[in-house]
Amino acid sequence: MPKRTLVTFPNDSLKEISSEVSFPLSEEDKSLIKDLKDTCVVEGGVGISAVQVGINKRIMLAAHDGELKAFINPVITSVSENNIINDKEGCLSFPGFFTKIKRYNNVCVRYYNEEGDQLIDSYEGFTARIVQHEVDHLDGIVMLDRMHRLDKDKFLRKRKRQYKKIKKVISQMMRSA
């Protein structure tokens, strides 16, 4: 099970827009999809995008019907504008952090599978939430961009305090070395 290293906030590469993948898939892309599956399973995730392992390609996985499904070059083509759910979300790139995010309860997505077949499928509920979250990653959008302003401010203040504590500990270690 080759696990890839996760890119975590505040790494700027999470804000980059991913490039489309061409077909037939290269061996490198096939290997990336397998590694994404392994990484997602090992990390206990329900979805992952290539950008989260430092690869800016439009490849993502989302849990659906008990398995991780690959979506290549996904595009959300329609949403249920009158059915928005505000629910908790986590992210492998924001370890241990969960916050409420508004998402459409139903989405229709056009994508390619690993064989290069173009598909159009509809998803609802939790799977729709995962698909939207991972497509956001491919578009350079992170949870912070979707959070309510007050939650975002609270998160950034907490993160700043954590960095100050870490900096202080490192400084003390350097002095005693």
What are these language model-derived features?
Residues 1-177:
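Positively charged
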